[in-house]
Curated annotation (Swiss-Prot):
Modified residues (4-hydroxyproline): 487
Function summary: Acts as a transcriptional regulator in adaptive response to low oxygen tension. Acts as a regulator of hypoxia-inducible gene expression. Plays a role in the development of the cardiorespiratory system.
Listed PROSITE patterns: BHLH, PAS
Spans annotated as NTAD: 450-501
Principal cellular location given in the protein's record: nucleus
Intracellular or extracellular location(s): Nucleus; Cytoplasm
The name this protein goes by in its record: Hypoxia-inducible factor 3-alpha
Gene3D superfamilies linked to this entry: Helix-loop-helix DNA-binding domain (4.10.280.10), PAS domain (3.30.450.20)
The bHLH domain, residue ranges: 12-65
Amino acid sequence: MDWDQDRSNTELRKEKSRDAARSRRSQETEVLYQLAHTLPFARGVSAHLDKASIMRLTISYLRMHRLCAAGEWNQVEKGGEPLDACYLKALEGFVMVLTAEGDMAYLSENVSKHLGLSQLELIGHSIFDFIHPCDQEELQDALTPRPNLSKKKLEAPTERHFSLRMKSTLTSRGRTLNLKAATWKVLHCSGHMRAYKPPAQTSPAGSPRSEPPLQCLVLICEAIPHPASLEPPLGRGAFLSRHSLDMKFTYCDERIAEVAGYSPDDLIGCSAYEYIHALDSDAVSRSIHTLLSKGQAVTGQYRFLARTGGYLWTQTQATVVSGGRGPQSESIICVHFLISRVEETGVVLSLEQTEQHTRRPPRLSASSQKGIPGNSVDSPAPRILAFLHPPALSEASLAADPRRFCSPDLRRLMAPILDGPPPAATPSTPQATRRPQSPLPADLPDKLTVGLENAHRLSTAQKNKTVETDLDIAQDPDTLDLEMLAPYISMDDDFQLNSSEQLPKVHRRPPRVARRPRARSFHGLSPPIPEPSLLPRWGSDPRLNCSSPSRGDRPTASLMPGTRKRALAQSSEDKGLELLETKPPKRSPRLEPGSFLLPPLSLSFLLQGRQLPGNQQDPRAPLVHSHEPLGLAPSLLSLCQHEETVQPRNRFPPAAGLGQTH
């Protein structure tokens, strides 16, 4: 019994709760519909609004009411007619008011004609939900108040001009699509950033209460029409042109002859920037940048130069049109609207406005071409044009004096070949005869080789006279080929040698041998020397091959595997110096002293003790010490048996411990 009574009480409480909730919802609905009827909309429109839309539109209405109360709006005079309907007809776009947060506080009724979205669907929403994501940063910058950077002007700049891509449900045929299938439409927006101070209000305590000023952006948004939607008769105050992506004319309407005095053929291939006033080129460049990034753009009012002088105020609507696949098939269609007639007709602002200016080279008459060699080299046309089309001459006349048919730049480039190197006289070589300035092509390889050898001998003779033996005197950096030398990299931090280590002895060079250039880098290990049978080195001598002696050389003992490569490397360096008397193109790296040569040995020789570079070697010291490997002595003797009697040089300085004989 008790259980049934508790169950009935629970059901009664639930029913009362449901009735109370139903009553609250009905009262809420009634209040919201009463609120909807108070909004300035038609009764048929407000009756179909949902609760969220009613709240959204009410908040927007309250914002606009505060703006109207704070702003200085022009009131309709007594006896005058209201002009609100005329404003919408005169405007080519719609009016939009944005708050500082980006909410659309107001849009005019004709927004549906441009975007396909009704006024009620947009008011109260954030504009960032309807514009292209790439344009949100630009709009946010326009909504931000800009500081006043000028001391003369008390007010900060409030004017705004930008382009937006906004969602549109209209098709080219006038049909309306779903919002999910909307496309992007470019709108040119221009307006001002306004700050309205609301009227002062009193608090319940009686003290005045001030509110911050209301910031809003009032814009007029105009849709840029596509060129395909324009009617064929544009009128006398407009003309059409087509450009490539670099704004060069590819087509121009014939009406430009009546308006600006240009012929369409004169503009083909010319850039549009050449016919724009210099003071307006920056503003037009920004509009072209917007055009290439968004597909459509409207320029501001700029001055288009007339043919006979002066300019016309013009405004241009540009659209990027694609005729196929790829960027090469794209072009720019421009519709130019003339705002004024030609002003300041007597002022010449560009070369395009002069009659003497032409882009094509002048044609020469037949009589003037007969007596001029080289087809009008001395013609009044630019000199470089004479080399674009040389006359048809025989090869013999070209070979006799080819410099006549070369441009000045080509003459300077071919001067070493056409003029030849200067003759050099050495004691051992007779003076070379002077070569003609224009040799035949068949003689160029041999004579150029002789000239290069003479230049090498001359430079070697000059260097032999000024050889420096002091290690403290650095080589002049101007005489070095810095492009062929590696930068100096100190290796002291990478290889920590013992404190008892000493550098090898310094060897003086004979006066007749040219000083080797100092290397600027040292990598620790010398590069491996390839086998002579696989890669013969330039300047090497086959007599140094111990395995196959020739020319009466007596056979040497069998060498150790490691000593053969060192002997070949050393012989190639000595023999190359004796035969050429010049420096070879590449040398083994060495340390900073200019006369110290690092032999191509392994790292174990570097880690042994050496004497200081300042100490001179004893001429009576033996070439091979008793503690060196026995297989190394014959190879070293073979290096010196074909050399001339010069001061002996020790290429392989022994270690401090091995230099002491028993």
